Amino acid sequence: MRSGVIAQKVGMTRVYNDAGEHVPVTVLRMDGCQVVATRTVEKNGYTAVQLGAGQAKVKNTSKAMRGNFAVANVEPKAKLAEFRVSEDNLLEIGTELKAGHFAAGQLVDVTGTTIGKGFAGAMKRHGFGGLRATHGVSVSHRSHGSTGSRQDPGKVFKNKKMAGHMGQTRVTTQNLEVVSTDEDRGLILIKGAVPGSKGAWIIVRDAVKSAAK
């Protein structure tokens, strides 16, 4: 099990394959993705690498984190993430990961924070059909209707689909295909959509379920 990478979402575009078909892709950019710390069995009880990406202003970095970056001899990073790895895949502190970490055709799991939509009703949030347009219904056409409760159990069960805050949640999309990489510009092109807005930090790992396909 090897480390993933931290990348930043640039946006979406399309590319053409050898058959002349256009393929929608999400463009991710890797910016100074380096190992800033390691975790070992002897010291921490598990093996992992902590990666940092992007650039952070020194004034916006805490004193403790400035000390950690100084020990690692790397510039302050805007985003940190830890990846569990096997012992033989531990990387040296300061090692920089490039877009060539992944190969074209490889399947990856992508994790990001979805775009927040604010408070949304049941029709938009869960695809409810709403109430009838006529026949006595007024004002509440887009309501979710009854929540299914009576004297017994006398409550609304937890996780009942209702109106509420939509989006702004951490989501992992599995088995997305890497269409191509550009190591010179630090770009990874992934087929399809990736959760998050433009500029969002994205975690890209080797797919864990690819063997089952």
From Swiss-Prot:
Keywords: Methylation, Ribonucleoprotein, Ribosomal protein, RNA-binding, rRNA-binding. Belongs to the universal ribosomal protein uL3 family. This is Large ribosomal subunit protein uL3. The gene is rplC. One of the primary rRNA binding proteins, it binds directly near the 3'-end of the 23S rRNA, where it nucleates assembly of the 50S subunit. Pfam families: Ribosomal_L3 (PF00297). GO terms for biological process: translation. GO terms for cellular component: cytosolic large ribosomal subunit. InterPro entries: Ribosomal_uL3, Ribosomal_uL3_bac/org-type, Ribosomal_uL3_CS, Transl_B-barrel_sf. Part of the 50S ribosomal subunit. Forms a cluster with proteins L14 and L19. Methylated by PrmB. The modification N5-methylglutamine is found at residue 151. GO terms for molecular function: rRNA binding; structural constituent of ribosome.
